[in-house]
Every structure is written in structure tokens, then in C-alpha cells.
Amino acid sequence: MKATVLAGLAAVIAAQGVAGHATFQQLWVDGEDKISACARLPLSNSPVTDVNSAEIACNANSGPAAEKCTVSAGGVVTVEMHQQPGDRSCDNEAIGGNHWGPVLVYMSKVDDSATADGSGGWFKIFEDTWAPAPNSNSGSDDYWGVKDLNAHCGRMDVPIPADLAPGDYLLRAEVIALHTASSPGGAQFYMTCYQLTVDGEGSQSPQTVSFPGAYSPSDPGIQINIYQKLTEYVSPGPAVIEGGTTVEAGTGGSTIPAN
């Protein structure tokens, strides 16, 4: 009987994990839906789990997109995540299965965003991570970036820093799911890279990190038990750059109406 119960529980957990797989698929620029024109879509909705893999940059098997999306420095892009390719229904969670964790966005200055391979330097422009909920005794009951994403049809508004130098960039949108992250290798990384051209007259050229290299499996924001009471959450990777955006979890999302 005990073995049967344990096997059943394992099956439920496994099914929950698969149900929660997702990808960032679409992009909006200042409220205009660009669909997936400039998204380097992964071939599956499965996560990357090895932070030392080359796939941690722009996901697995993600070839160049059809186009580049143009945005002005100081403008807003909206990244959009869903569980299944082509499904933009707001009736389904963007990423289900209690895949709580942060939403992080990076950019990389490149010569040509249509051909860049993601191996260049990255800087963080946005994060919506964690905040404590009143009377919570478990991190899973707290506020998370993923919960903000789910509450807004998978969409998250991401301001482009106003002083960013013009040119081509890759934009890397990422969810780190922490539901099985209490041991090394348990965190799940869901990312997509978008091909951008940034217009403007800025001059900001931030310091960068590399993917792989920016994360370690034992980083406190990657190896963490979110089912215990949390008093803090340390966001993985570098700090958000000057002029970037840090959103308090529970307040993030998008102003684009649900369809």
C-alpha cells in the first residue's frame, strides 16, 4: 500500500511538472502585437536545467527569427509566455504546476541580432522576483514574478532603459521555476531570446556577464526550498543596471488587456 501511494504521488508530481512547461513566444512593442516575428522560438516547451550548458543563453535549438523588432530606448516591450505553442488563451495559466519563481530579463549588445549566437555579454534590465505575503509560512504562498505573469495572461511589461546606446540587441526573457529547486540541478530555466533593434541617442554600455557563467547551481536564488518560510530571496545573476526596472512581486504584469 505504501509503495502504491508513493508511486501515485510521484506520478502526480511528474504530471504537474510536465503540465507546467512553457515558453516565451510573443513580443509586443509599445502595445503593438508583433506576434512571434522576432522571437527565437525553442523547439519544445521543456526547461533547461544545466546552468553550464550553452543552451542557458537562448534555449535549445532556437534558430534565428524571421525579423527584428524595432523599439526606442525608453519604450516598453511586453514579453508573453504560454504553455503550448500558438496557444494565447488567457483561460490557461502562462506556466502552471505551481512553477513559482522570478521573471528576469537581460539584453546583449550585438552587431546583428539576426545572426548573434548569444555568446556575448549580457546585462540585466528587469526583474520581478519575490515578496512576502501576509501571514505566510511557506514561500510557495508568497508573491512571485511567475504569479504576476499568470495573472496577466502571460504578459510582463519590460521598459527598455532610456539611455541605452542604439543598435542591435538580443533580449533574453527568463522564468526560473523553483518548485523542485531544493537540491542542485532542480531549478528549471525557461528562456527565449528576441531579436531587437534599439533606436535612440543614448550612450549607456553596461558591464556584462556571460551565459553560461552568470549562474551557479548552488546560488541561493537557484538552489532553494520555497516550501519553507522565506525571509529573503537573492535574485540570481548580476544586479539590474542603472536605468533598469525592479518590480515588487505582487505588483508586476502588463497593462495590455486580456483577450
UniProtKB/Swiss-Prot annotation:
The family database entries (Pfam families) matched by this protein are listed as: AA9
- What's the superkingdom here? Eukaryota
GO CC term, one of those recorded = extracellular region
The cofactor(s) it depends on are: Cu(2+)
| This protein's record includes keyword Protein transport | no
Swiss-Prot/TrEMBL catalytic activity? [(1->4)-beta-D-glucosyl]n+m + reduced acceptor + O2 = 4-dehydro-beta-D-glucosyl-[(1->4)-beta-D-glucosyl]n-1 + [(1->4)-beta-D-glucosyl]m + acceptor + H2O
Q: Which UniProt keywords apply?
A: Carbohydrate metabolism, Cellulose degradation, Copper, Disulfide bond, Metal-binding, Monooxygenase, Oxidoreductase, Polysaccharide degradation, Secreted, Signal
Locate the coiled-coil region(s) and give their ranges: none
Induction per the UniProt record: Expression is up-regulated during growth on wheat bran compared to that on glucose.
Q: Which GO terms describe its molecular function?
A: metal ion binding; monooxygenase activity
Residues involved in O2 binding? H179, Q188
The entry's free-text remark on the cofactor is: Binds 1 copper ion per subunit.
GO process annotations (BP): cellulose catabolic process
Q: Which cysteine pairs make disulfide bonds?
A: C69-C193
UniProt binding sites for Cu(2+):
H21, H99, Y190
Does the record carry Amino-acid biosynthesis as a key word? no
Q: In UniProt terms, what function does this protein have?
A: Lytic polysaccharide monooxygenase (LPMO) that depolymerizes crystalline and amorphous polysaccharides via the oxidation of scissile alpha- or beta-(1-4)-glycosidic bonds, yielding C1 or C4 oxidation products. Catalysis by LPMOs requires the reduction of the active-site copper from Cu(II) to Cu(I) by a reducing agent and H(2)O(2) or O(2) as a cosubstrate.
UniProt name for this protein: AA9 family lytic polysaccharide monooxygenase E
Q: Which organism is it from?
A: Malbranchea cinnamomea (Thermophilic fungus)
Gene behind this chain? LPMO9E
